[in-house]
């Protein structure tokens, strides 16, 4: 942007300040983190970095770290790519453990007892407008070097497909065993727990896939943080649990932990750690 401005108005160079200051905020806790988190201040020159730091210093209580704008932009991409890689490791473990007959939640809990191990929790993929998007900027710009980053994206995208196949197999098995189609509760559409943000949500992608590929199945779609959706009728989480033969946990919203951990008349598929037994 600076290059475009100064190409058209070269006399403005040195008279206006431009800086890139990536946000580090958690959905659902934005204001607190906007104020308290450390910030990276990337100016196109020292004067720009100083001016931006002075502005952010008026309301940010965290430390301000000045650098150049290119490093600041890469810092944002690297932060989210790092999270994506770590989540991919957890998601890959969950698929390995399913084949090996090992409880992945117990395994991760035990492995994390090691003082230098901190494995994240697996889910049904990665969503949101940052972690699921930013790695592509690095892998597309540096395709020969960004091997791990690109592979992590593939793993996290595949995890959603894996969940779809697991759910479809459970539905087909129920039909063969009971000679009828099941009611299926799809629990959660948001990309992470306890928010209403559906952007790039793997849970949403899974729900849409199942809804489209199994039109004769009754799906009870649950998202306690929204009141309506243009594509689905939203069902209360308790009603969906009670009425469904198969319960599929896609997002670990706090309300779901109030439901029974076991039910003799239901098959429960837990892709996000609501039930960790």
Description of each model-found segment:
Residues 1-277:
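Structural/interface elements that position substrates and couple domains in central-metabolism enzymes
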């Amino acid at each position: 942007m600076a290059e475009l401005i100064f190409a058209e108005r070269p006399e403005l160079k040195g008279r206006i300040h431009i800086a890139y200051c990536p946000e580090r905020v958690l959905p659902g806790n934005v204001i607190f983190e906007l104020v308290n988190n450390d910030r990276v201040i990337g100016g196109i020159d020292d004067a720009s970095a100083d001016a931006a730091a002075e502005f952010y210093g008026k309301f940010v209580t965290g430390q301000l770290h000045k650098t150049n704008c290119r490093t600041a932009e890469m810092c944002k991409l690297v932060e989210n790519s790092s999270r994506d890689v770590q989540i991919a490791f957890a998601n890959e473990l969950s698929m390995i453990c399913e084949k090996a007959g090992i409880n992945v939640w117990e395994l991760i809990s035990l492995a994390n007892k090691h003082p230098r191990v901190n494995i994240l929790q697996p889910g049904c993929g990665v969503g949101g407008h940052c972690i699921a998007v930013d790695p592509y900027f690095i892998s597309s710009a540096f395709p020969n070097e960004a091997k791990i980053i690109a592979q992590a994206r593939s793993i996290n995208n595949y995890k959603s497909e894996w969940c779809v196949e697991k759910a479809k197999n459970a539905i087909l098995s129920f039909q063969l065993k009971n000679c009828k189609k099941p009611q299926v509760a799809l629990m959660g559409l948001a990309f992470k727990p306890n928010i209403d943000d559906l952007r790039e949500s793997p849970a949403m992608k899974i729900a849409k896939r199942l809804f489209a590929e199994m039109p004769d199945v009754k799906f009870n779609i649950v998202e306690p943080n929204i009141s309506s959706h243009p594509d689905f009728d939203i069902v209360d989480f308790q009603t969906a649990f009670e009425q469904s033969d198969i319960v599929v946990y896609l997002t670990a919203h706090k309300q779901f932990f109030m439901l029974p951990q076991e039910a003799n008349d239901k098959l429960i598929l837990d892709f996000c750690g609501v039930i960790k037994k």
